[in-house]
């Protein structure tokens, strides 16, 4: 009996059981071995099996911000904290470095939902505009959902555990300055924003949490009433509201306390020259009657150097140090058992040698769903076309693998596309662009989406009128440093419309479509387009083709 026969004799269920005990990174590598393994490890049955297995071993997820980068780590969440004394040091190790996420990400605009990180407003490297981004911090995969429109106020990501669907709730101002609500379901095929009705006009705050299929966030009614907690049922897409005046003037962080909605805040004071810290916690005991329980716990005086990561399923409030250090500690406080535990986390990464911003999420479960989303929603990377033999090249790239082209018709319609290939060293399974193009509602005039004809991919097109773009010193809509603007007058008369097509991060792909007025100097305008792309993106090879 040869090896192939030995492998065939192993039951498939046993093979999947073995794979389910592996790490997410190892599974990603195994998917690259063969088409059979890719199909087997991407099957919904295995995805659910892996999630069930991971749920038995929740982890702490750490995000560390270093300059303009976010690095994600995870560590096993201790399960036997209370088998020893009330104050014990535990020593745990970080898992391998998972993700290096470039871009400008602000702390209060990064949320955690069912194993995924959502950035409602993220500045992508090399782009001076904001995007929505969802990522799996363990596999390093992420998807750019859409450009952010100018009038948008806030957006939240929610998860429906019954239908296993992610939805984005967006709030934006209409032409009358009133906040309107839209919902986007992340699913295969055509996706579009749907306008939904909210019975209470309100201004959303940053604090939010998604628990048991309900998205909670703090808000202030526009009529000037007391603060409320908006409860958005992700599945039914209906709103309910809870009075939040019990919080008073406290700055509240919403939490999931053993399946109940809760809020946490701090109070600092100085007594006899000593700094005191008190932890205030509210728990919603009765949703219908809106009955809250309030708890106050004294904490060590140096607790102001820590932040609340969340509450574990066992009721432990988790505190993490605000900045990286060696040693690095995590504290577990259990109000019911009146215990205070300290866990030392060992991280050998260089990021812990300096002070970098840290925040953490509790009960993190490694999930492969994003890989399945990749399989369902992924767009194949745009690749350069085959070179035509006749058209002459007017500019030559310093690198042969970067190509671009311009095609000129009798209507003076021009297209410029640049391709930047994947960075060397990235693993094959760390791909991006997981969703089909977003089709927007009629109220979104800033963005239009079209299906690419010659590829099974998509192009997300942001369409702007030239005058709007030229207000910011750059005909491409990108702000630049203040300088002599006399040259802009020619651009105003020359460029009629500019379409920016932008999809990728990692594999950067930019395509611009420019309509030029007949009286304009075609070559001069095209040279400016090429100059801009070369300056801000990649070196390209350009071909001009004149149609008869």
UniProtKB/Swiss-Prot annotation:
Q: Identify the stretch(es) annotated as Disordered.
A: 380-404
Residues annotated as coiled-coil are none
Compositionally biased residues, Pro residues: 382-392
User: What InterPro entries is this protein classified in?
Assistant: F-box-assoc_dom_typ3, F-box-assoc_interact_dom, F-box-like_dom_sf, F-box_dom
Q: Where is the F-box domain?
A: 4-53
A Pfam family matched in the record:
FBA_3
Which NCBIfam families is this protein grouped with? Answer: F_box_assoc_1
In Swiss-Prot or TrEMBL terms, this protein is called Putative F-box protein At1g33020
């Amino acid at each position: 009996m040869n090896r192939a026969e030995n492998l065939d004799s192993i039951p498939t269920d046993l093979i999947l059981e073995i794979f389910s005990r592996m790490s997410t990174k190892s599974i990603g590598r195994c998917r690259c071995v063969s088409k059979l393994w890719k199909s087997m490890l991407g099957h919904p049955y295995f995805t659910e099996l892996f999630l069930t297995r991971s749920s038995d071993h929740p982890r702490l997820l750490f995000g560390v911000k270093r300059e303009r980068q976010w690095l994600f780590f995870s560590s096993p969440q201790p399960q036997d904290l209370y088998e020893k004394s009330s104050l014990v040091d535990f020593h745990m190790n970080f898992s391998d470095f998972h993700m290096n996420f470039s871009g400008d990400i602000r702390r209060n605009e990064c949320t955690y939902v069912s194993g995924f990180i959502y950035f409602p407003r993220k500045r992508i490297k090399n782009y001076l505009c904001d995007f929505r981004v969802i990522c799996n911090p363990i596999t390093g995969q992420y998807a750019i959902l859409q450009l952010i429109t100018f009038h948008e106020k806030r957006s939240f990501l929610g998860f429906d555990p019954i239908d296993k669907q992610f939805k984005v709730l967006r709030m934006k101002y209409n032409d009358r300055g009133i906040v309107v609500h839209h919902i986007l379901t992340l699913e295969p095929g055509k996706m579009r924003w749907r306008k939904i009705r909210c019975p209470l006009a309100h201004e959303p705050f940053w604090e939010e949490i998604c628990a048991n299929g309900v998205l909670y966030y703090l808000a202030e009614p526009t009529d000037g009433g007391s603060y409320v907690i908006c409860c958005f049922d992700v599945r039914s897409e209906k709103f309910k509201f809870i009075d939040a005046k019990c919080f008073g003037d406290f700055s509240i962080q919403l939490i999931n306390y053993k399946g109940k909605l809760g809020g946490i805040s701090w109070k600092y004071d100085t007594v006899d020259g000593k700094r005191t810290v008190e932890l205030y916690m509210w728990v919603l005991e009765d949703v219908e009657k809106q009955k809250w329980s309030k708890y106050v716990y004294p904490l060590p005086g140096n607790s102001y150097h820590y932040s609340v990561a969340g509450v574990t399923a066992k009721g432990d409030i988790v505190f993490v140090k605000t900045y990286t250090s060696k040693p690095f500690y995590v504290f577990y406080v259990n109000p019911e058992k009146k215990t205070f535990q300290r866990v030392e986390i060992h991280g050998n990464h260089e990021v812990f040698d300096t002070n970098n911003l840290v925040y953490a999420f509790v009960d993190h479960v490694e999930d492969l769903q994003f890989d399945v989303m990749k399989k369902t929603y992924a767009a194949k990377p745009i690749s350069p076309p085959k070179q035509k033999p006749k058209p002459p090249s007017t500019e030559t790239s310093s690198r042969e693998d970067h190509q671009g082209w311009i095609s000129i018709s009798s209507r003076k319609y021009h297209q410029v596309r640049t391709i930047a290939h994947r960075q060397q060293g990235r693993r094959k399974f760390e791909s991006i662009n997981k969703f089909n193009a977003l089709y927007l509602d009629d109220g979104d005039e800033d963005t239009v989406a079209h299906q690419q004809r010659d590829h099974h991919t998509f192009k997300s097109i942001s369409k702007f009128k030239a005058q709007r773009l030229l207000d910011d010193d750059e005909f491409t809509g990108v702000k630049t440093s203040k300088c002599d603007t006399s040259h802009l007058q020619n651009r105003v008369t020359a460029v009629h419309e500019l379409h920016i097509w932008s999809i990728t991060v990692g594999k950067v792909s930019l395509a611009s479509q420019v309509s030029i007025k007949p009286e304009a100097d075609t070559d001069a305008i095209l040279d400016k387009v090429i100059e801009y792309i070369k300056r801000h993106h990649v070196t390209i090879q350009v071909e001009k083709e004149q149609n008869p």
